[in-house]
Amino acid sequence: MNYNDTTEFCFPFGQPSFPTSAMTEGSFDGQFSEFDPTFTSPADTALSDIANLPIDLHKDALFANAPGKGDVDFDSVSMLQLLSDYPLAFNSTENNQKLQTNPSARWSLLDSMDFDNQRQCSDLESAQLGDSGLLKSTILSNSHIDIAALSSSKTSEPTPPFSYVQTPCIPTPSSALIDTPFPGALDSEFGFDESQAPLFPASDGDCQRAFASISYPTNYGCKLSNLGFMSPQSPVKRELNDSTSPSKLSESSSSLTGSSSALLSQSEFLGSVPSLSDSIATVDPFFSFESFETDEKARSLLMDASLKLPQFSTPNLSSNSSSLSLKSTLAEGMKGSTPLAAVKTEKASKAARVMKQKKHREHVCFNCGVTETPLWRRTSDKLNFLCNACGLYNKQYGVMRPLSPRNKGSSKALENLVCANCSSTKTSLWRKDRHGQTVCNACGLYARLHGHNRPIGLKKNKITRRRRGKGPGGEDGMSDEVKSEFPVLSKSVTMAEILSSKGLESPQLTNSVSVSKMPNTDADVSLEHAKISFDSLDNSVIVKKEEEIENKFSVSC
């Protein structure tokens, strides 16, 4: 595409612009028109987005005959002021601007306008917009901003910032409005129509005034303002001492809204509330004063209970007859509702429920039929329960414990038994030998210990039971019966007898040593208990014999 054509594309201000095809297909090779610093825009011209379209200057377009085909230039300082503080930039020109309700409708008339070369810009000097100091300044080239459309348009555009300027200033292009449910009382301050409020107020004061202006209809036909926001024009200074009184509340509410007659009086509202004594009489009873010893405890509990009620008035508990009667007003209908009794019954019911839930299984002994025992056991087949006694007996003997005592006839039959070894008829326990014969307890133990039958010479006619420790026999621990049966143990043993039993001969020793039996033991013999008598012996022989005896006894022990 050849862009070197003689046709030039310019804005209505005379400013050349790129064709749409040049922006998409390649770079622009055409020539820009010359710069004319004396050019100004007509006041009647209200531009819109249509001004961005390219226009052929050879077809009697607007400003085609202007001298020098002047371009529009923008001042950087004015541009910065315009973008940063838009309302302030137009404060100086608001009276000279001619507002247009429909800017785009004026554009169709520009083709019929005829500009003469002789007139140059004389007609433009009388334009309202030309008189402003904003567009008479030096304008930077190659800038595309539709100033006339922004200044003359009253239509709203949903672009930030969302704020308003106070009347009679022109609102910014951002006028995002919301509909409020109730008409505001202070809408005139913002320059809105009815039932419209800014979405984002410009300052904190606007936010407070907007909330303070919201009114709510009541049944009495009056408006009750939102007391949570104070108007910045009439601040209310509250004191700590008088802030809670009904009169101060009514005054503060009237100062917030500006009309005290339209507000519901706080004192009238509090006067319609029943007193504490009336409210207590209608409260359901929850305790009885009969359960307390003194009236002081009842008063203290009443004060605690009154905290749960509405705090409209202070009760007078000091009076006796005119005010609350502790035992006449509240105790009526409260009989039988003592808290202690209720707690006891509740605990008893809970305990009963727990006992029912934790009821133990009732076991019965399979053998003897008892229901109580320190420990329940089971039979060998694990099918039945046994008490502790029957379980131990069954575990030891493999049979059930007998329930009836032993018959005396069976004991009489045992009296006819005779030991097969010693022919004894009395014993503490009858046993069986390895051949199956009945033997006494002594013969049975001896045969089990030594592996052969007990000698008949060891038989004794009287049954003696073993006693552990020192017995009644004295230091030796032997009873008289044992000494009578075994006289050898009670006699002293001479040294000659000891030597002869060991195969030693000592003709020179005659009745020289006598050894007594040590208590409780048979082999524990020492020289301390030996009684030696010397007749006529050499010392060397005696020492030698003593060493031999000591060695023999040490080996035997």
Curated annotation (Swiss-Prot):
The lineage of its organism: Eukaryota, Fungi, Dikarya, Ascomycota, Taphrinomycotina. Residues 243-258 have a biased composition (Low complexity). This is Transcription factor fil1. It comes from Schizosaccharomyces pombe (strain 972 / ATCC 24843). The keyword Metal-binding applies. Activates genes required for amino acid biosynthesis and acts as a master transcriptional regulator during amino acid starvation. Binds variations of the DNA sequence 5'-GAT[AC]GC-3'. The keyword Transmembrane helix does not apply. One of its GO terms (molecular function) is zinc ion binding. The gene is fil1. A zinc finger (GATA-type) spans 365-390, 419-443. Pfam families: GATA. Disruption phenotype: Decreases the mRNA level of genes involved in amino acid biosynthesis. Increases the mRNA level of genes involved in the response to nitrogen starvation, including genes required for the mating response. Decreases vegetative cell population growth rate in low nutrient conditions. CDD domains: ZnF_GATA. Induction: Translation is induced by amino acid starvation. Translational repression during nutrient-rich conditions is dependent on several uORFs (upstream open reading frames) present in the 5'-UTR of the mRNA; these promote ribosome dissociation. Translational induction occurs in conditions reducing translation machinery efficiency, leading to ribosomes scanning over the uORFs, and increased translation of the mRNA. Functional homolog of the S.cerevisiae GCN4 and mammalian ATF4 bZIP transcription factors. PANTHER family: IRON-SENSING TRANSCRIPTIONAL REPRESSOR-RELATED (PTHR10071:SF335), TRANSCRIPTION FACTOR GATA FAMILY MEMBER (PTHR10071). Residues 234-258 are annotated as: Disordered. GO terms for biological process: negative regulation of TORC1 signaling; negative regulation of transcription by RNA polymerase II; positive regulation of autophagy; positive regulation of transcription by RNA polymerase II. It is found in: Nucleus; Cytoplasm. GO terms for cellular component: cytosol; nucleus. Keywords: Activator, Cytoplasm, DNA-binding, Metal-binding, Nucleus, Repeat, Transcription, Transcription regulation, Zinc, Zinc-finger.
